[in-house]
Amino acid sequence: MKIGPVGKHDARSTTIVNWDEGSHDGFISQIFLSHGVAGIMSIQFQFVMDGKLVLSDRHGPFSGNMFDVIELNYPHEYITGISGEYYKYEANNPHMRSLKFNTNTSEYGPFGTSGSSNDKFAFKLGKSPQFGGFHGTYDASGLQYIGVYLRPKTVLPKIDTGNAEETESKIVLG
């Protein structure tokens, strides 16, 4: 299930690049972010697929005066949400201003910058490992849009009916 993307781009930009990391049947083990005072410049991922580490393409220019590596404790830690801010007006810099990643055990970020001219977003993906990947766009000035894939649960949880029957048998009428 494709959710988003959120963000905005400069209509004057002629170099918009779409990217999609949702086709991987693996888990993200690391996220690489290049950012600065203008916002998120680039994002890149490392996946675990078939027992091997696979590095995605970098999405955005490798610039910005800050670089962060988010290391997830694979296979015990997984993404449960992403939130952030994007600039709502046209500008000649990245519109994705800040990103924060939530997992089942930790919170990473926010990375980038915050401001009153920004719109906020949040994708909350539940407590179980349903995250399926990222997608978005970038141009020469940085990350413009970002969205996520959700893999809904495909197995029903087992319901313990033993306790329910026991509880019902203790009810006394009259």
Swiss-Prot record:
Gene ablation phenotype (knockout): Susceptible to systemic infection by tobacco etch virus (TEV).
Induction remark: Regulated by the transcription factors NAC045 and NAC086.
Keyword DNA-binding listed: no
InterPro entries per the UniProt record, alphabetical: Jacalin-like_lectin_dom, Jacalin-like_lectin_dom_plant, Jacalin-like_lectin_dom_sf
GO CC field: cytoplasm
Chief site of localization: cytoplasm
Assembly and interaction partners: Self-interacts. Interacts with RTM3.
Protein name: Protein RESTRICTED TEV MOVEMENT 1
Annotated ranges, domain Jacalin-type lectin: 1-152
Example of a GO biological process term: transport of virus in host, tissue to tissue
Function: Required for the restriction of long-distance movement of the pathogenic tobacco etch virus (TEV) without causing a hypersensitive response or inducing systemic acquired resistance.
Family: Belongs to the jacalin lectin family.
GO molecular function: carbohydrate binding
Domain of life: Eukaryota
